[in-house]
């Protein structure tokens, strides 16, 4: 419960779980798409928009750094050296312990009972505010001492969170609050939702079990973490090479690589040893006319040792045991309780509907691959398409924009994003000066998020260029959540003799975060997020960073998360911004990718244009996209099967389950001697929720087509999204939000029929990239 995504030590690319005290085919088919022919007017680029271009394209020449003022990380004056972070963690721990004691004493006063939900949220925020900062520092700071200090702070406070997760006293106090109708009546809908989230998370921690069973829960949880760590290490362990005869590489499409490999074989007079995942392996899979080398590489790439399989099956078994310990039939039942899906049966309904929709398209694509294979081998009848044929007969195409575009620099894309947000929400991005010591690297740029009515509503720190010792991939870090702070009643907090300076240190850290917004009651802690990517650095010789289209998609995706954090300003941090259900959190970010399908939106990348003449354009469909989508649906089904009650069956065999699913519901036959499941890392981070990305893709596709496609820059539609979805964070039932946004009251119940309906919605996005979070 109190164990935040900040405590997601094991798999940072997994979907962030919303913990409460948490961290914190024949020739390629061409389709013609009609693009209306009317002129659409849009707002001109502002001076601030244009400054974004210089900020990111000429960072050395920008004036984003202040040469006079100095401070500490994120503007906290004391965080100027690594030891200060350790000191802050210790001060936070003292103050958190005192706040915990205040909550435990709440039964002595009805007035204190009324404040319990607020104080639980304060406690969560107090800890997460440091844990989340430490998580960012240990993933992004270039200096070893800072990373070590961040690890120490992170582990110290996570250890205390783990105590709170199973704290019987806190649970009993919350139970008193929720059992008293007169107190419940005083809670706002948002406060009540926050209380229910705390309650459910306590119950998932076996809080109401006898001591011996609670101890077993702790032991099982520890085993799961340990096995999860081993599983992820195994998933990332390189697979052994396979032996390829040089004679099997004759006729390679990539002639340069083919010649080099054959020369290597002649020189060594040995078969080639090709490592799965290497450039050579990828080239062979895409360009070797002979089937045998592709088959061998496929099998090698999907191989496992018995020990690797054993670790996964032990993890699945321990999860099932933990679920049954607290009265749930399976880990899937336990996990899905507070998700949009609610039950494994509803997930099955969704996946079945999605399979039924996608299967005809996938089979049509597979038939085309079979025709290509037949022609290639001059066969009298259509052959079976095997898994190792996919890339050879249908090489994956990189994502491409729907219309021809000039090279897009990083600054140009940020300018386009700012212009898009101003059209949709009346919000823009503005370069801001950062004081000396405020950022952890010279590359980091600070942006103010500015609302036309309320002024600054949050900050984004953009750390976008690759460097050594920086976390890989793209990620959105919520370093500070939104919440209301003027009703904290700090005066009622307990004190401890001799600890006054530590209490003041923690209070000073929190005071920096607070702001009073125009036209809004109260004082708020404003959100602060960090975007991490690893784009190429601009230079004098190469010029500004030019993004590939997939990188533009990535940036739009992550900025979807960032704007959810900015606009999801709630009174309780536990439900702010992206603090929402796992199977809902990707909706805003995937929807952002859809905007890149619109030439009207793409015209915002031109600073001097205020109109777009939209004419008929051609869109080249990837004929194998449906095969890939179907494969992802199958993986979601595997995830559900692995987390069903069958995981406790003594005869459970993860490889047999995988083979059975492939042979009964897959497109291509299962390949003997393969066991891909040991490399399916999301089985840990996404356990029982891998369907979520598909689910949000389906909803985002329908939201785009029904709400935005006709007029993507329309302010009223943007305000509709903001008012019905983004501003609520996780404070409202996601089904209610989707139902209101789509004007489909039949979805509001979120029942099996609603899940089935979403499964029927065609996933029209050709922009999604699996695994981006």
Swiss-Prot record:
Coiled-coil segments on the chain, per record: none
Cofactor: Zn(2+)
Catalytic activity: Release of an N-terminal octapeptide as second stage of processing of some proteins imported into the mitochondrion
Transit peptide: 1-35
Gene Ontology CC: mitochondrial matrix
EC number in record: 3.4.24.59
GO molecular function (one): metalloendopeptidase activity
Gene3D superfamilies: 1.10.1370.40, Neurolysin, domain 3 (1.10.1370.10)
Alphabetical list of PANTHER family matching this protein: MITOCHONDRIAL INTERMEDIATE PEPTIDASE, PROTEASE M3 THIMET OLIGOPEPTIDASE-RELATED
Name of protein: Mitochondrial intermediate peptidase
Organism: Coprinellus disseminatus
Gene: OCT1
């Amino acid at each position: 419960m109190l164990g935040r995504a900040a405590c997601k030590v094991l798999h940072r690319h997994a979907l962030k779980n919303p913990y409460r005290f948490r961290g914190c085919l024949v020739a390629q088919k061409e389709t013609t798409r009609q693009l209306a022919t009317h002129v659409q007017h849009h707002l001109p680029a502002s001076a601030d928009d244009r400054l974004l271009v210089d900020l990111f394209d000429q960072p050395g020449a920008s004036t984003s750094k202040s040469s006079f003022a100095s401070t500490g990380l994120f503007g906290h004056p004391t965080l100027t050296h690594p030891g200060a972070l350790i000191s802050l963690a210790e001060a936070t721990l003292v103050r958190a312990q005192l706040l915990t004691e205040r909550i435990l004493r709440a039964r002595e006063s009805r007035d204190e009972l009324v404040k319990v939900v607020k104080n639980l949220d304060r406690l969560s925020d107090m800890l997460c505010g440091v844990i989340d900062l430490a998580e960012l520092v240990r993933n992004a700071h270039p200096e070893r001492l800072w990373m070590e200090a961040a690890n120490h702070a992170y582990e110290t406070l996570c250890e205390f969170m783990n105590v709170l997760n199973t704290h019987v006293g806190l649970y009993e106090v919350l139970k008193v609050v929720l059992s008293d109708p007169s107190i419940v009546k005083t809670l706002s809908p948002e406060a009540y939702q926050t209380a229910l989230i705390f309650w459910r998370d306590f119950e998932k921690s076996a809080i109401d079990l006898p001591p011996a069973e609670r101890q077993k829960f702790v032991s099982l949880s520890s085993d799961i973490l340990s096995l999860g760590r081993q599983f992820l290490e195994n998933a990332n362990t390189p697979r052994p090479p396979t032996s390829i005869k040089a004679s099997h590489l004759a006729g390679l499409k990539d002639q340069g690589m083919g010649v080099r490999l054959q020369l290597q074989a002649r020189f060594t007079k040995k078969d080639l040893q090709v490592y799965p995942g290497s450039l050579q392996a990828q080239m062979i899979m895409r360009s070797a006319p002979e089937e045998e080398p592709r088959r061998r590489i496929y099998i090698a790439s999907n191989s496992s040792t018995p020990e690797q399989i054993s670790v996964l099956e032990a993890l699945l078994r321990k999860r099932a045991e933990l679920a049954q310990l607290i009265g749930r039939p399976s880990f899937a039942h336990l996990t899905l309780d507070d998700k949009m899906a609610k039950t494994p049966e509803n997930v099955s309904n969704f996946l079945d509907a999605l399979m039924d929709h996608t299967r005809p398209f996938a089979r049509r694509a597979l038939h085309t691959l079979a025709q290509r294979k037949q022609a290639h081998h001059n066969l009298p009848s259509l052959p079976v398409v095997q898994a190792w044929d996919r890339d050879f007969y249908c090489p994956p195409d990189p994502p491409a924009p729907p219309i021809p575009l000039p090279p897009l620099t990083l600054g140009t894309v940020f300018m386009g994003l700012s212009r898009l947000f101003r059209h949709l929400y009346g919000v823009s991005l503005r370069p801001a000066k950062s004081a000396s010591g405020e950022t952890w690297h010279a590359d980091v740029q600070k942006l103010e998020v500015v609302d036309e009515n309320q002024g600054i509503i949050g900050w984004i720190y953009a750390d976008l260029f690759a460097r050594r010792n920086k976390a890989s991939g793209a990620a959105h870090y919520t370093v500070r959540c939104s919440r209301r702070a003027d009703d904290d009643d700090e005066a009622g907090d307990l004190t401890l003799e001799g600890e006054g300076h530590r209490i003041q240190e923690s209070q000073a850290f929190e005071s920096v975060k607070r702001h009073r917004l125009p036209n809004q009651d109260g004082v708020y802690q404003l959100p602060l997020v960090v975007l991490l990517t690893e784009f190429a650095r601009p230079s004098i010789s190469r010029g500004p960073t030019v993004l590939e289209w997939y990188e533009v998609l990535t940036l739009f995706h992550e900025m979807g998360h960032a704007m959810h954090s900015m606009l999801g300003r709630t009174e309780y941090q536990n439900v702010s911004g992206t603090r929402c259900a796992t199977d809902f959190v990707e909706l805003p970010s995937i929807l952002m990718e859809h905007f890149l399908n619109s030439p009207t939106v793409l015209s915002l990348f031109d600073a001097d244009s205020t109109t777009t003449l939209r004419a008929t354009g051609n869109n080249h469909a990837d004929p194998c996209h449906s095969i890939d989508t179907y494969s992802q649906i199958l993986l979601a089904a595997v995830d559900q099967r692995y987390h069903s009650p069958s995981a406790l069956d003594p005869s459970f065999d993860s490889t047999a389950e995988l083979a059975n699913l492939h042979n009964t519901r897959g497109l291509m036959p299962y390949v003997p001697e393969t066991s891909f499941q040991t490399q399916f890392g999301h089985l840990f981070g996404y356990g029982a929720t891998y369907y979520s990305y598909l689910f949000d893709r389906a909803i985002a596709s329908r939201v785009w087509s029904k709400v935005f496609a006709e007029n993507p820059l329309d302010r009223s539609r943007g305000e509709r999204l903001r008012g019905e979805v983004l501003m609520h964070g996780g404070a409202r039932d996601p089904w209610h939000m989707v139902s209101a946004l789509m004007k489909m009251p039949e979805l509001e119940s979120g029942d099996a029929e609603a899940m089935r309906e979403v499964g029927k919605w065609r996933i029209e996005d050709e922009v999604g990239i699996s695994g981006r979070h």
